[in-house]
């Protein structure tokens, strides 16, 4: 079974 090609979404940076 081939795993789905998911993209590593950028981590939400806190706006300080």
Curated annotation (Swiss-Prot):
Disulfide bonding pattern of the chain: none
Keyword Ribonucleoprotein assigned: no
Induction: By bacterial infection.
GO CC, alphabetical: extracellular region
GO biological process: defense response to Gram-negative bacterium; innate immune response
Keywords in alphabetical order: Antibiotic, Antimicrobial, Immunity, Innate immunity
Known role: Antibacterial peptide active against Gram-negative bacteria.
Protein name, entry field: Metalnikowin-3
Organism of this sequence: Palomena prasina (Green shield bug)
């Amino acid at each position: 079974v081939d795993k789905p090609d998911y993209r590593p979404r950028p981590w939400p940076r806190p706006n300080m």
